[in-house]
Amino acid sequence: MRKERFKLKIFYSASFLGFLLLLLNSSYLASFGTPSLFYISNVFIHILIGIGLIPFFTLFVSRSFADMLHIGKIAIVLLITGIISGLWLMVVGATTPNRWLLISHIVVTTVGSILLILHFIWYRVSFIRHSFTKIAGVTLAVALIFPVVVKIYRNYVPESDYLVQNPIHDIPTSMYEEGGGTNSPFFPSSAETATGNLIPTDFFLTSKTCAEKGCHPDVYRQWNESAHHFSSFNNQWYRKSVMYMQDVNGIQSSKWCGGCHDPAIMFNGIMDRPIRENMHTPAAQAGLACTACHSIERVKDTMGNGGYTIKYPPLHDIAASQNKVVRKLHNYIIQLDPEPHRRSFIKPFHRENTAEFCSTCHKVHLDKPVNNFRWFRGFNTYDQWQTSGVSHQGALSFYYPDEPKKCVDCHMPLVPSKDAGNKRGKIKSHRFVGANTALPYVNKHPDQLEAVTNFLQDDKVTIDIFALVNENKITAPIGQSNAKAFPGDDVRVDVVVRTRGVGHHFPAGTIDAFDIWLELKATDEDGKIIFWNGMIDAKDGKNGQVDPNAHFYKSHLIDEHGNHINKRNAWAARTILYSRTIPPGAADTVRYRLIIPEDCGKRITLQAKLNYRKFNWWLTQWSYAGVRDPDHTDFQVDKGYDNGKWVFTGDTSQVAGEIKEIPNPPIVVISEDQATLEIVQTDSVSTDSTELKTKSDVRDQERWNDYGIGLLRQGDLKGAEAAFLKVVKINPNYMDGYVNIARCRIKEGNHSSAEEVLKKAEELKQHLDPKDPNRAKVDYFYALTQKSQGRYDVALKHLRMASEQFPRDKRVRNEIGRLLYLERRYAEAVTEFQKTLEVDPEDVDAHYHLMLSYHALKDQLKAVKAQKLYLRFKLDESVDPITGIGRRANPYANMERQKIREHLSSIASYQY
């Protein structure tokens, strides 16, 4: 009997120790989620101990349940529930849709364990020594407190690699100091690997495995048709450009592209050889694979150029194992405990700093190792967003959305899915919808093309045929003011283009390669075309070049010899002939000159369209079939220029995509508008000398405001002020109307008059919510009026009010720093400019004033560094003469360069 009792005691004691060990194991699993073999081993240990304790637990319950206190019985019920939920988790897994089950398992087992140990302590169970109860209490306390301490520590001391922080003191003075420098195998890309070594190709060829076993099939299908998938040599436009780059500029410089376009071949060293040798390999066709974004371990800063560090996950060899048993075991572990997998592929910046994460590849500059010239801005989508109202970080926007938005809010919207990672039946779309209609067209992906088309047409940009201007008479809005004209009249039609659902400039990206233009057509009552600007020179009206006299939204870059940069040869760009974009929440006013024919009838119909073609016609022809003109042998070509001519007769049988001929990418009408002009005879109406004929109500407040914004941005300050005065006449309580009048007067230099209207704006500001983002602009512009009059203290007071609301607005910070410098408070000025650099390390105004401030402080070492950075980022005036060559070579581009211009009809019978 004693022997049996002793065995039973040993049995219970061993099971109790196993229970305590399970508590500690659970505490570790709750505290960490490390993608390591040690953590994975603990997951298995958790299962083994848990299953192993079931027989002991069953025997204990059968013998002791009847004699237990109520607290003990409750504990048993909870632990039984925990066992059932644990076994269920082993079958269905703890993926996001089953998160509730995991949480339930944790809660019931935790509470049950606490109650059971309390029962043991209070009831003094006979088979447990008193010392064991103390150990149990300590174990329970450790198991409960340890995860809490770890969570608090991580919250207050986040891992430094996951913080996106711009340098202040270590900003590179040249591209040679960026990334890993010249010793990096990936230079001149700023991208690096965690070890500095190459990464096996197979790592980037496993995207399809992400769809296996029902994990992420929807994500994979979406990505498979996206522009990210076709970022590399499976994209003919990119392929031709890089081949040309390697031919003209050398192989090394093409790595500058590789960090964001070709990680599969750059990180394995293949890009050290001509791409023609490997163009059709799986690695060259991989694009931006799942692992390319999700294995990024660190985002270094927001200076772009692929400024990230990528890490080969420690468990990837197991995931990619050729052994089916090992892979099945790996897949089961991911399903059972996805946390290590999640930690490997989802970093905090993937969720919290999404815009900064996107900046790594959506902000670009070139420098000497790439362009054999100097620092030159490529595109800068990140800063456009950061300084705008859309981010709620910019103080000076004309309009603000109710809530701030990031890149993913528009480009990765929530869509229905049953993928393992879904939350309440939704996932972030991995189509990355943007504006690339060309790739889904040539790849024959109708779903992607439809998604992109719908995205473009979803009120992202709108147009408004707004005003009729006849000499000094303005009739607006045309549709509500019974706009009239007379036969023979020479009138101007103003069309307003407004950005609404765009979080960056419209357009954005490599805008020199796009065809985005406004088209205006006028027809008489018989349907005869009497005016047409912006047509396409082709029989079908589609497959041809756009009317060069049209109003374009693009940039026109020129090379060292003044040639147009038309082959995506950005390394040869030396200056910009013109660049026309519209910031978020802003507008552009486009002017057309129309002569009313004598025989046009009683009415003229105006139709305006904002057209979009992803790649311009010439670039598409060149990308697919461009070869050197055999008749043009006397040409010059070097790294900085190409004077050669091209013909489009090349072989297209091996081009990327499903279409093996020169394609005709679709033209999408982003927005359109229509209006009617009434044509009356001279003797049927009385002469009216009124300068402004309008019929407006509160609904037209925004239309007039947009009209004024467009005129203001062009520099038509008087016209803009007249429009804004109309705005405040319609709605005297519209604060922004007065602010916009002040903008015009400040630009004119009429600061005292601007001060008067800003006082009215200040009165209206008092009625706004303290968090209303529109408040700060009143303080900013009022500060400018005070600064111009030497009232620096008042100006500083208002600027600090603006910066308190918008601490990341560079313009506000720089104004504060400038005033502090003028007041000879140099150390304080340095502090302000450093705050600017925390947001944008390439801000030229900040570096200029830091140079001045350090000189004033006699800190020559820092002054020299600031001077180097200022000279690096400032515009190069020495290239200005090149623009003259480009302007003479292209008179249409020269006209587009003008801030204010009138567009004429391009049809032959009305060519003036």
Please place each PLM-identified region on the residue numbering.
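Structural signature of tandem alpha-helical TPR/SEL1-like repeats
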Residues: Q714-K726, K747-K765, N774, D779, ...
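Structural marker of alpha-solenoid helical repeat scaffolds
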Residues: I730, L764-K771, Q805, V839, ...
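Primarily the internal scaffold of c-type cytochrome electron-transfer domains
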Residues: R124-I128, T133, Y153-L198, V219, ...
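Membrane-embedded alpha-helical bundles that constitute the cytochrome b-like, heme-associated redox core
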Residues: M1-Q165, S174-M175
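Helix-start (N-cap) detector for alpha-helical repeat units in TPR-like alpha-solenoids
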Residues: Q701, M735-D736, D769-K777, K810-R811, ...
